[in-house]
């Protein structure tokens, strides 16, 4: 378990955020299972980067595989189990885990913009169109070559 931001079971990641959250990259070897303590005040979701396995345990275990997303209900643990065999492209069950304290605010979305009200979305669109979001040089982001 690599904690990227926030805190998981007393381990703190290097990333910072404006709201309480936890983000981790979890690697589960074939046939293994991990039970991760989770803040019961946080929501949680898991996105599978590679491999296949299950989320949850017992009667609540659900199958999940590459590019699928699981949204968890309330609770204080997240259980991830890797299938005993993985496909030839991966050696493990790789999961991006994230969650945080729900902000319980109105959300308005239009295209890639998400704000708290319609006026906020309109302002974000205008800011983007006028170049106020800044500039990323073409060579600043290197492609992922997994």
Segments from the language model and where they lie:
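Jelly-roll (double-stranded beta-helix
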Residues: 1-146
């Amino acid at each position: 378990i690599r904690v990227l931001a926030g805190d998981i079971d007393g381990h703190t990641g290097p990333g910072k955020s404006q709201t309480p959250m936890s983000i981790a990259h979890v690697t589960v070897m074939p046939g293994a299972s991990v039970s991760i303590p989770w803040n019961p005040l946080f929501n949680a979701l898991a996105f599978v980067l590679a491999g296949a396995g299950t989320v949850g345990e017992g009667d609540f275990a659900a199958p999940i595989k590459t590019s699928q997303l699981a949204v968890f209900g309330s609770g204080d643990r997240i259980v991830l189990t890797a299938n005993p065999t993985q496909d030839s492209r991966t050696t493990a069950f790789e999961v991006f885990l994230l969650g945080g304290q729900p902000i319980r605010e109105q959300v308005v979305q239009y295209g890639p913009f998400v704000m708290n009200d319609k006026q906020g979305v309109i302002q974000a669109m205008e800011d983007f169109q006028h170049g106020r979001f800044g500039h990323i040089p073409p060579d600043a982001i290197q492609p992922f070559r997994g």
